[in-house]
Swiss-Prot record:
Post-translational modification: Is synthesized initially as an inactive proenzyme. Formation of the active enzyme involves a self-maturation process in which the active site pyruvoyl group is generated from an internal serine residue via an autocatalytic post-translational modification. Two non-identical subunits are generated from the proenzyme in this reaction, and the pyruvate is formed at the N-terminus of the alpha chain, which is derived from the carboxyl end of the proenzyme.
Keyword Ubl conjugation annotated: no
GO BP, sorted A to Z: phosphatidylethanolamine biosynthetic process
UniProt subunit comment: Heterodimer of a large membrane-associated beta subunit and a small pyruvoyl-containing alpha subunit.
Reaction catalyzed: a 1,2-diacyl-sn-glycero-3-phospho-L-serine + H(+) = a 1,2-diacyl-sn-glycero-3-phosphoethanolamine + CO2
Superkingdom of origin organism: Bacteria
Membrane topology: Peripheral membrane protein
Pathway stated in the Swiss-Prot or TrEMBL entry: Phospholipid metabolism; phosphatidylethanolamine biosynthesis; phosphatidylethanolamine from CDP-diacylglycerol: step 2/2
Designated name of the protein: Phosphatidylserine decarboxylase proenzyme
Site (Cleavage (non-hydrolytic)) location in chain: 182-183
EC number(s) reported in the record: 4.1.1.65
Pfam families for this protein: PS_Dcarbxylase
Origin species: Neisseria meningitidis serogroup B (strain ATCC BAA-335 / MC58)
Length: 265
């Protein structure tokens, strides 16, 4: 296990909100006493929501890690809409009490980032994957396998933040994005990946292994090479006489012609 923690325990995305809530709570406390209680509740909730603790990271090179905390809502064979290939799809739904920073599920190089505008339906629904605002990161793992992980906005979450771009190298567990206030992440893996979770399972970001992905793609069966055709000598037939036969026939024709000349004389 490896412990990766290159960021504060409270996500930077929450600093303005927490700072504002704290200042307002103190001000109302001084002026109005117990009337400040709702403001303190909001500030504590913001602290809880924007927490971003360090996690233990599995080092198995075949492990694909959960990029977020949450609950598994989809494990199925599906079509990766960004690569147009069959894939193993695993979706994680995050409620407002989960850690909402997104981290890389594997050591990989980002090849493309695709942003799509959309709606803000409940992220727990299947149609959220295709209808909601979303941001897809297409990447190639260190072993050359292609994976896709998609940030999907939700009913309350209306701000997707992505800090990576094409060409960037991400280490497993490295922070690359954030979605505020409830959302979803869809993972598309090669079809030979073996799911290690089931629908309903609770997962912990970068500590839970979602799937095992072989380092090399399965070999496709190649067609057997055809054997070279045997070269056979031409068959001698009446329509295809040999050179020796042609010589004999020519000599016989000459003799016959000579005999006919003698008879004429």
């Amino acid at each position: 296990m490896n412990r990766l923690y290159p960021h504060p325990i409270i996500a930077r995305e929450g600093w303005p909100i927490i700072g504002g809530g704290l200042a307002l709570s103190l001000l109302v406390s001084i002026c109005c006493g117990w009337w400040s209680l709702p403001f303190w509740v909001f500030t504590v909730f913001a602290l809880q929501f924007f927490r971003d603790p360090a996690r233990e990271i599995p080092l198995n090179p075949e492990a694909v890690l959960s990029p977020v905390d949450g609950r598994i809502v989809v494990v199925e064979r599906a079509r990766d809409p960004y690569r147009d290939v069959d894939a193993l799809k695993i979706s994680i739904f995050m409620n407002v009490f989960n850690v909402h920073s997104q981290k890389s599920p594997a050591d990989c190089t980002v090849t493309k980032v695709v942003y799509n505008k959309g709606k803000f339906v409940n992220a727990d629904l299947d149609k959220a994957s295709t209808e909601n605002e979303r941001n897809a990161v297409l990447a190639t793992t260190a072993s050359g396998r292609e994976i896709t992980f998609v940030q999907v906005a939700g009913l309350v979450a209306r701000r997707i933040l992505c800090y990576t771009q094409a060409g960037a190298k991400l280490s497993r567990g490295e922070r690359y994005g954030f979605i505020r206030f409830g959302s979803r992440v869809d993972m598309y893996l090669p079809v030979d990946a073996q799911a290690q979770v089931a629908i309903g399972d609770k997962v912990t970001g970068v500590s839970t292994v979602l799937a095992r992905l072989p380092l090399t793609a399965p070999q496709t069966e190649s067609e057997p090479e055809s054997e070279p055709a045997l070269q056979t000598a031409p068959v001698e037939t009446a329509a295809n006489p040999s050179a020796e036969q042609r010589q004999i026939e020519a000599a016989a024709a000459k003799i016959q012609a000579a005999v006919q000349d003698v008879l004429k004389d």
